[in-house]
A protein has these predicted regions:
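Nucleic-acid-binding surface
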Residues: 3-7, 17, 35-180
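Short, surface-exposed ligand-recognition loops at beta-strand->loop->(often short) alpha-helix junctions
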Residues: 10
Length: 180
């Protein structure tokens, strides 16, 4: 289990007892403000605790959905446009307008670590929106993987989501030409 400092205060009762638990190796300080009863904690678990409202997106979401075997160097996290800058070398922050942030948001689970991630349907829209920014080979790999699972996806949900984004006609046209 992973805790913030405030959660440790609730659990142990005082800063003194937290320090005592640390000294007795009942609790480990993972990084500033993050503690765990286990010595080894995944980066994903740390980031979901530190940034609970952030949503895995882009390269990270493509990887966790099994659409690419390229392990991202950074964790791509979507936050509301009005959010403050997240200062963390492990992440790439993607600002998303408030009216679009929750579209396709779902909960994922990786080895008991729960996290927010965009659905495969939402990520297909993101792939089509940002195809000119992504490396061509990477884009093609993910697109081909989408073609293989297209019958598992909810097409009406994709169309509904796409209509809420700017340049929705371009997204829908690319969906029809390149995926369906």
């Amino acid at each position: 289990m992973i805790y913030t400092y405030d959660e440790c205060l609730d659990k142990y009762g005082s800063d003194y007892l937290i320090k005592k638990a640390l000294k007795e190796n009942k609790l480990y300080k993972i990084e500033k403000g993050i503690y765990s009863e286990n010595k080894n904690v995944s980066v994903l678990e740390i980031l979901t605790k530190r940034y609970p409202k952030a949503i895995l997106t882009m390269n990270t979401a493509f990887y966790y959905h099994g659409l690419t075997d390229v392990i991202p160097e950074l964790y791509y996290l979507a936050t509301v446009s009005s959010s403050k800058k997240l200062v963390d070398k492990r992440i790439k922050q993607i600002y998303v307008p408030e009216d679009l942030i929750d579209i396709g948001k779902e909960e994922g689970n990786n080895n008991g670590v729960k996290y927010n991630i965009y659905s495969k349907e939402r990520m297909l829209i993101e792939l089509l929106r940002f195809k000119n920014i992504l490396p061509y080979d990477y884009y093609k790999e993910i697109l081909n993987n989408y073609r293989e699972i297209i019958y598992e996806l909810n097409i009406s949900k994709i169309e509904k989501y796409a209509k809420q984004f700017p340049k929705s006609k371009m997204i829908l046209e690319a969906l029809r030409k390149e995926v369906l």
